[in-house]
């Protein structure tokens, strides 16, 4: 008589198991049957809370995925995984990384992001085979002083932490290609940053930088630089040395001028200068021959340089909310321009040469002081022409008329002439979503007081007079908070939890701590 042999007895040589998104509460027992052969185990996006002792007998593992669970402890037995190459324990509830992690000598890729960690173990720099390390959003306050011993690192992600400085040894990471320091509390960038000659991507957004070191110009291989949401008042002339740069974001700073050296960035494709204090652009901007997107929103520009017409590849130009009183006729030289936004300026006329931008599909001139439009616009194949916030359709019906001052034929419609708005301080305007400035002149009041004015608002006013007479009649509907506010809330909760853990010990009742954190979240 023949008996059916269970499938797992027929095949004990299993190298990979994928149990992602299976609502697992415990590690499945059958996994241990393949301990001698299992090299890849993916248990991401489940409800695991602990890793049993038997789990660390899977010593052949080379790739382990445990992200998006509820794991509360990473035991010292992690040292058993001496062949582990990839480890992902991101977005769990792990309060610390054991010092024994140093025994995982083969580890090359590690992600500890989104855990309530405040530090990395001192032994961490012994993992000298690491090439990619992600420790984003863990409330990290400092890096090990010997972080430079990780000399094989190519990618280091430290976003959304509480770092205030960088250790000197960081610049020993000579193979580093990607460094993400966004949304920390860094005040100074060391001059030695210029020694990271292989760096391709550098993210410094959302810090407290007031200047960039001259040595940043040594980064000849840099492709992407983001220094938005800082306190920069000037850029060093040496920025002209970033000859490989294709993406440059300097939004939400305090810049009043841009150095002429910007014109040497011949490969630059995207340049974002919105929400600064620029009153003019250098003529050298026209030498950025590969520029496709130029964002100038919310500055103090009175006009655009004539050299703007040399940007033959420019497809998106946004200069909303400036003080533009005129446009150069050379704007027509932007032969690839598809979207041109100059909303909320002080323009009284558009140059007829705009029609030479034959690829133009969207033209937004709402909120200006235009009396009419040039007849030449009829030659364009526009898909949208915005003249007013109250415009219900992207295109309108126009009539021809004669300009009494010049005798030229012009275009007019029911929304022309535009009504001039009363002079208003730009800084007093409510900011809208991602365009809201984090660096405007404001006092250092508590976040809770400041956040009310940072989110966008929809107002319903009968008229200005009624508003002055009875301010309480104004209905304001406020939008969802900017993600930055939500992140600050999260940090507040995490800090409270860390304080409670320190007071009660890590083995205290976690449910009680979480309950307290939930109360804080509700109050915030």
Curated annotation (Swiss-Prot):
LRR repeat coordinates: 11-34, 35-58, 60-81, 83-105, 107-126, 127-149, 150-172, 173-196, 198-218, 219-242, 244-264, 265-288, 290-310, 311-334, 336-356, 357-380, 382-405
Major localisation: cytoplasm
Subunit structure: Interacts with DLG1. May form a complex with DLG1 and ERBIN, where interaction between LRRC1 and ERBIN is indirect.
Designated name of the protein: Leucine-rich repeat-containing protein 1
Domain of life: Eukaryota
InterPro entries assigned: Leu-rich_rpt, Leu-rich_rpt_typical-subtyp, LRR_dom_sf, LRR_R13L4/SHOC2-like, Synaptic_Scaffolding_LAP-MAGUK
Residues bearing PTM Phosphothreonine: 480
A GO CC term attached to the entry: cytosol
Lineage of producing organism: Eukaryota, Metazoa, Chordata, Craniata, Vertebrata
The entry's keywords: Coiled coil, Cytoplasm, Leucine-rich repeat, Membrane, Phosphoprotein, Repeat
Organism of this sequence: Mus musculus
